[in-house]
Amino acid sequence: MSGFSKFLDSIFAFFRSLYARPAPQPPVPPARDDINPPAVRVTQRVLLVAYNPLINPGTGQKLFDIMGWRTPESLCEGFMADIMETSAGLASFQVVEQAEINDILPFKDGFRYEPAALMDVLQRRAAPYRAEQVDYAELLARLDALRRVSAGDFDEVWVFGYPHAGFYESIMGGAGAFFCNSNPLTGTETCPRRLIVMGFSVERGVGEMLESFGHRCESIVRQVYAGQPAEANYFARFTRYDKVAPGMAEVGNVHFAPNSEKDYDWGNPRFVPSRCDDWFNFPNLGSSARQVNCDEWGKGEIRQHHIWWLRHFPHAAGQINGVANNWWRYLMDPNQVGKRL
């Protein structure tokens, strides 16, 4: 072939390349879910509310000072340290704002204590008013909580009240709210995020705060495993105790240790076989049972039992059937429940 012919062929090849269809490319596979999500740390931001009524306007005396109770700040310090420790550092609460309510909130039915009547109840000179609950709508409106949670100012609300104030240990509101040791708050669906209102008491201790949090945990993990087949419901297995599953105890629940025979029976010295240690290896279950009794969890002390119980909650990487092996992901942030990993 002459040089001129080669030149013409190169020219034709150039023009053909301008109008030719591009060579087909191999299809790009769809992005797949991370089948081994890491056990990431979760931090919940808290609005801390002291429900501390003004009892004597003349002297400025408020309820907490008159009664000599603990401060919310001192209780929070111990509670938050326990959560950090039991979660192996994967869960933490951060108080981002504090507020104080100095008048007396109404109950849901409209009843409201006068300061003198409230003191009579708290000092046991009169019987308490038996109402279903405090007016949560009034509380949330005062705090502008629905809008502010929607805006991301904070994630949940902790209210430190007093005996007979009408607060549940925990209650959930917002779009998609579900049972959280009490029925969901109605009229809160305008908030696109689930929010939890914890009800604590300055009359009590850190152990009782862990009790309230423990019931929150029970409700949330039950919701996580709702709809799972029985053999895949790991929380049902986690909560077994000897009284209802003889010889098959695992960790138990908030009220029942592995060997408990009644509610709050955390000081029972009876030995029973338990696979509680198995949960430190989750999801690789299969360890042998061993004999345990109350020596393991504080011999009846409420705080020590609840710390022991919470330490057993899984916090591993990965997932099974779409449920994260790190349960703290859900215990802290209810918006993770039902969310695709």
How should each PLM-predicted stretch be described?
Residues 203-223:
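Active-site recognition of the HExxH zinc-binding catalytic motif
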